[in-house]
Amino acid sequence: GGGLMYAEKEVNRVYASRLAKRGYIVVCINYSLCPDVTYPTQVSDVMASYRWVAENGENFGFDLDRVFVAGDSAGGQLAFYTAAVNTSDELKSLYGVSDTGLNIKAIGLISGMFDMKNGVNSALLSCYLGYDYKNSPYYPYLQPEEIIDKSDIPPAYIVTSVKDFLHSASDDLDKLLTEKGKEHMYHDWQLTVNRSSGHITSVAYPDLPESAETIDEMLAFFEAHS
C-alpha cells in the first residue's frame, strides 16, 4: 500500500504472519516509490518478483502450482494490474516486461486503488506519470476496463468496507467484473462494533474477528481456485 509513494514490506509483517500461520509460504516484496521513479516502474518491480518466485521457488519449497497474489490499497492496484499483465503478451510489450513463468491462480484485492485515471487527482497523476501525464502511453491503461479487455484476469477476491475512503473503487470493480463475466467474489463490510468499516482493516488489524473472517474467506476463495 501507500499510494505508490510510501510504505515498505515490513509494514505488513503481522498480516503476512497471519497468512503463514494458516499454512502458506508468504513472499513480501518492496517496490520502487514515487517520486523517485515514475509509474509503471512499480509494475516492472512486481513482475520481477514473480520471476524470482518462479526461478527460485523449488529452493524454498514453494508449491508453484498454487500461487496466489494479494495486495492492499496501492498494492491491490499492483496485484490486479500485474496479474493481468502476466497473462497478456500485448500488455507485457506495453510495460516492457518479459514473461515471468508464473501461473497466478487467484488474487486478493483489499481496499484497492484501482481506477487511477478517474479516481486520482491531477497532482498525484503528475507524480506518477510526469507533468505531461495525459500523453503518457500508460495513461489510457490507468482504469481497469482497458486492462481487463486485454488480459485473462485471474479469479479475484475483492474486499472493502462502508467507510473505506476507496470504497467506490472496489464497488466499481465488482460491477465491471460482473459486466465482463469475470469470476470474482465481493465482500463489502458494513458498520460493526470494531473497525471493519475502515480502509485495509484486515491488513492493519488482522486479529479483529472481522479481519480473521475476511482472511479466512479470501484463503477459502484461493483454495477453491487452486
Where is each model-derived feature located?
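Alpha/beta-hydrolase superfamily serine-hydrolase fold, recognizing
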Residues: 1-226
